[in-house]
Amino acid sequence: MSNKVNFKTASFLFSVCLALSAFNAHANKSDAAAKQIKKLEEDFDGRIGVFAIDTGSGNTFGYRSDERFPLCSSFKGFLAAAVLERVQQKKLDINQKVKYESRDLEYHSPITTKYKGSGMTLGDMASAALQYSDNGATNIIMERFLGGPEGMTKFMRSIGDNEFRLDRWELELNTAIPGDKRDTSTPKAVANSLNKLALGNVLNAKVKAIYQNWLKGNTTGDARIRASVPADWVVGDKTGSCGAYGTANDYAVIWPKNRAPLIVSIYTTRKSKDDKHSDKTIAEASRIAIQAID
C-alpha cells in the first residue's frame, strides 16, 4: 500500500514539475518577446498593440493588448461576419440582389463601382468589404442591413465583445486622433472576437466555412501578418489603414502545418498626423508574437 501511495505521489509531483517547467518556458518566451516588441516600438516611434493565441496549447501573448487603438477598416472583417450571422438566422438572404447608385459609393469602392448598373448580391458585397476594403459595400450594408455603426457595435456585444465600438461611417472613422475613443477596440478583444467568429460556435459549420474562405481571400494583407509566416501556412486576415497618425493594423487566423490554428492581432499608431504607417513593423510584431506562443 505504501509503495502504491509513494508511486502516485511521485507521479503527481512529476506532472506538476512538467507543468511548471512548461509554464516557466512560456513565461520566459513572453518576457523576451515583450522586450523585442518594446525595441520595435521605439524604432517605430509609436504604439504597438499585440495579442496572439495558440488555440491548441492555450498559450497567449500580449503587449499593450488592453489599450485602445483605431480600428480603421479592420472592422469590415466583423461586418462580413455580422452579415453571415444574420444569414444563418434566416434574417438575410446571401443571394439577395442589392441595387445602388453612384451617389451611394464612397472613395475607394473598387468592386461596387464595377457593378453599379447591375447591382451585386449581398454575399458578394460583404466579401468585397472584407477582401477589397470596399467602402461603398461597407456603408450600404451597414445602412440597409445592420443598423449602422450602432448596429455593428450591438452585434459585437452580442458575441461578448465589450471593447469594440463603431461610432462613424466610412470615411469619417479614419481620423485616428490620439486619445479619441471613437471607432476603437483593443488587440485582445479583436483577437478573442475573431477566434469566436472564425473558429468558435457563433457561426455554424456551413456559414463559418464561407467566412474562413472570405478571410483567406483577402487581397490587402500580403505585406503584414502574411509576410511573417512560412509560405505553406494558410492565412485569413483583415487589414486596416487610416491614412493618418501612421495608423494601420491587421488581424488573422493562421493555419500552420500540422498544428492547431493561431490567432494574431496587431494594431499600430503614431504621434503626428502626417506620420506614415509601417507594414514591416506589423509583420515583425506578428513574427515575434507567434514565436512567443510557440
From Swiss-Prot:
It catalyses: a beta-lactam + H2O = a substituted beta-amino acid. It is an enzyme of class 3 (hydrolase). InterPro entries: Beta-lactam/transpept-like, Beta-lactam_cat, Beta-lactam_class-A. Keywords: Antibiotic resistance, Disulfide bond, Hydrolase, Signal. Partially inhibited by the beta-lactamase-blocking agents, clavulanic acid and tazobactam. Not inhibited by EDTA. Changing residue 207 to E: Similar catalytic efficiency to wild-type with respect to penicillins, cephalosporins and carbapenems. The active site is at residues 73, 172. Residues 1-27 form the signal peptide. A beta-lactam binds at residues 73, 76, 133, 135, 239. Transmembrane segments: none annotated. Disulfide bonds join 72-242. GO terms for molecular function: beta-lactamase activity. It comes from the Bacteria. GO terms for biological process: beta-lactam antibiotic catabolic process; response to antibiotic. Induction: Up-regulated by the carbapenem, imipenem. Expression probably regulated by upstream promoter elements. The class A beta-lactamase family has a specific amino-acid numbering system, sometimes called Ambler or ABL numbering and often misspelt as Amber. A multiple sequence alignment was used to derive a consensus sequence and then the consensus was numbered taking into account insertions and deletions. This allows use of identical numbers, e.g. for active site residues, despite differences in protein length. UniProt always uses natural numbering of residues, hence there appear to be differences in numbering between this entry and some papers. Belongs to the class-A beta-lactamase family. This is Beta-lactamase SME-1. It comes from Serratia marcescens. The lineage of its organism: Bacteria, Pseudomonadati, Pseudomonadota, Gammaproteobacteria, Enterobacterales. The gene is SME-1.
